[in-house]
Amino acid sequence: MEKILVFKNYENIPFGKIFQIRFKEPMGIKKCPYLYRWTLIIFGYTTRLHHWLRSDDRRYFHDHSCDLISIIIKGKYFNVIPDKNGNPIKYLAEAWKPRFMKAEQRHYLDIPKEGAWTILLCSKPYHKWGFYVNNHKWRPLRYFHKFGIIQTEDYQ
């Protein structure tokens, strides 16, 4: 039986849709994750703590499901975005300098060997995220099924 938490305007919504906590989720390959993620979701808004060990998949740019503010609390990384011709441009992101990003902004993160820790403050999701292969959006499951996960132990 599913527990129901009742709030004004939130009657009959399962508790897990209103409030969730997730601890140290490994992202990527379990034996060598590229990222560990801690997540707090309250009424659709999300706060995340990320411990970056390796870079995002650099083969293609991706977007996100929501607008976000990213704050590096330890380390640094490069936020790589496409220019008007789709060529990558690297921007250094440093600790304690908040960065706002719209959900539709295509990018990937290039993480140095030292790794990085970030806090993400996320809006409610409103956009289906994916990878842009030859300017065509591929949803994550289809993308990884076709191209595989490349963040192995020797990937940086």
Predicted segment positions?
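Ligand-binding loop in jelly-roll beta-barrel domains
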Residues: K102-K128
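A short, N-terminal "cap"/entry segment at the start of jelly-roll beta-barrel domains
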Residues: M1-T46, P88-I89
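Short acidic-glycine-tyrosine-enriched beta hairpin
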Residues: I81-Y108
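Short, conserved beta-strand element in jelly-roll/cupin
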Residues: D63-F78
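Conserved short histidine dyad/triad with adjacent acidic residue
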Residues: T46-H64, A103
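Acidic/serine-rich, low-complexity amphipathic helices located in mid- to C-terminal regulatory regions
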Residues: R99, K113-L121, V133-R142
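Active-site or metal-binding loop neighborhoods of secreted/extracellular toxin and effector enzymes
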Residues: W129-Q156
